[in-house]
């Protein structure tokens, strides 16, 4: 969170404040951005599934209107979350990233996973509640490791078939039940490129709301083995010199930060700051 944006559980029964509207097509935006006067937004003909109070931006309360479908609003259009990450104000992206995670959770937890009965929204904590089961469901967070493997002035970068053409990045993967982040790192590296690592160093973390990952970032040194790419997961993987890198991930991502940080340290440059 930033000084401008703090999360909070707010009662939707209160009035006023700002609101964002999210549909399966993205967030509603106009020439001023994605934050709208809440009272005005609620007067539009929107197909609202639920409303959640999500925090404060510049001291003002912010609410999420999660929509069943996208509606036409004069002077507005729909924009995906990734575009906000790549462009514009990063603090606004943080608001929308949090809203997207809460909206996804609210949409997916309308019914109890145990008995199938409708769940009700609790306004004093971030939870959905099933009264027959006395079951509370909280927003999902999926821990994932992401690692830059280094070998002196070389870094190991790979690309997935899902990547933008030409872009190479670090290795990453979800933690399994019972694993530590370090154990996940070792396993994922073995699975994806079949090499061994040592001297695992935690660097930092970043929320990745696509849809609900918590990325735990590491540097690790190459310890042995030859690259063998995992079929269907890795399209190409190779060692690159810090002096001659391929196209890299977006500048606001932790993947890019891990790369830029190592390059800066090897070349004696000013270290970058991880976007929080």
UniProtKB/Swiss-Prot annotation:
BP GO annotations? NAD catabolic process; NADH metabolic process; NADP catabolic process
Q: What class of enzyme is it?
A: hydrolase
Tell me the residue numbers annotated for binding Zn(2+). Answer: 112, 115, 130, 133
Keyword RNA-binding among UniProt keywords: no
Identify the EC number(s): 3.6.1.-, 3.6.1.22
- Please provide the record's keywords in A-Z order: Hydrolase, Magnesium, Manganese, Metal-binding, NAD, Zinc
- Record's GO cellular component terms: cytosol
The residues that the entry says bind substrate are: 82, 125, 138, 206-213, 255
Co-factor(s) = Mg(2+); Mn(2+); Zn(2+)
The UniProt GO MF terms for this protein read: magnesium ion binding; manganese ion binding; NAD+ diphosphatase activity; NADH pyrophosphatase activity; RNA NAD-cap (NMN-forming) hydrolase activity; zinc ion binding
**Entry cofactor note text?**
Divalent metal cations. Mg(2+) or Mn(2+).
Q: Which residues bind a divalent metal cation 3?
A: 188, 192, 233
The record lists a divalent metal cation 2 as bound by 188
Q: Catalysed reaction per UniProt?
A: a 5'-end NAD(+)-phospho-ribonucleoside in mRNA + H2O = a 5'-end phospho-adenosine-phospho-ribonucleoside in mRNA + beta-nicotinamide D-ribonucleotide + 2 H(+); NAD(+) + H2O = beta-nicotinamide D-ribonucleotide + AMP + 2 H(+); NADH + H2O = reduced beta-nicotinamide D-ribonucleotide + AMP + 2 H(+)
**Record: residues binding a divalent metal cation 1:** 172, 192, 233
Among InterPro entries, the record links this protein to: NAD-cap_RNA_hydrolase_NudC, NADH_PPase-like_N, NudC-like_C, NUDIX_hydrolase-like_dom_sf, NUDIX_hydrolase_dom, RNA_Hydrolase_NudC, Znr_NADH_PPase
Q: Which residues form a coiled coil?
A: none
Which residue range or ranges hold the Nudix hydrolase domain? 139-262
Query: Which residue ranges does the UniProt annotation give for the motif Nudix box?
Result: 173-194
What PROSITE patterns does the annotation carry?
A: NUDIX
Role:
mRNA decapping enzyme that specifically removes the nicotinamide adenine dinucleotide (NAD) cap from a subset of mRNAs by hydrolyzing the diphosphate linkage to produce nicotinamide mononucleotide (NMN) and 5' monophosphate mRNA. The NAD-cap is present at the 5'-end of some mRNAs and stabilizes RNA against 5'-processing. Has preference for mRNAs with a 5'-end purine. Catalyzes the hydrolysis of a broad range of dinucleotide pyrophosphates.
What is its quaternary makeup?
Answer: Homodimer.
The similarity annotation says: Belongs to the Nudix hydrolase family. NudC subfamily.
Its protein name is: NAD-capped RNA hydrolase NudC
């Amino acid at each position: 969170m930033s000084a401008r944006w703090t999360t909070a559980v707010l009662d939707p029964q209160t009035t006023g404040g700002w609101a964002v509207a999210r549909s399966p097509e993205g967030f509603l935006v106009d020439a001023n951005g994605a934050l709208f006067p809440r009272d005005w937004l609620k007067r539009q003909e929107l197909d609202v599934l639920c409303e959640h109070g999500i925090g404060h931006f510049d001291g003002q309360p912010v609410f999420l209107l999660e929509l069943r479908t996208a509606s036409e609003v004069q002077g507005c259009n729909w924009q995906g979350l990734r575009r906000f990450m790549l462009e514009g104000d990063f603090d606004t992206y943080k608001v929308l990233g949090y809203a997207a995670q809460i909206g996804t959770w609210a949409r997916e937890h309308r019914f109890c996973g145990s008995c199938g009965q409708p769940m009700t929204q609790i306004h004093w904590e971030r939870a959905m509640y099933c009264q027959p089961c006395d079951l509370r469901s909280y927003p999902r967070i999926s821990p994932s490791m992401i690692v830059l493997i280094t070998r002196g002035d070389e870094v190991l970068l790979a690309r997935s078939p899902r990547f933008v053409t030409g872009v190479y990045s670090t290795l990453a993967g979800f933690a399994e039940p019972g694993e530590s982040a370090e154990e996940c790192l070792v396993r994922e590296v073995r699975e994806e490129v079949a090499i061994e690592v040592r001297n695992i160093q935690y660097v930092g973390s970043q929320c990745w709301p696509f849809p609900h990952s918590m990325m735990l970032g590491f540097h690790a040194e190459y310890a042995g083995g030859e690259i063998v790419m995992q079929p269907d997961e890795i399209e190409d993987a190779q060692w690159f010199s810090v002096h001659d890198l391929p196209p890299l991930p977006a500048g606001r991502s932790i993947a890019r930060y891990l790369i830029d940080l190592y390059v800066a340290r090897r070349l004696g440059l000013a270290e970058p700051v991880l976007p929080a």
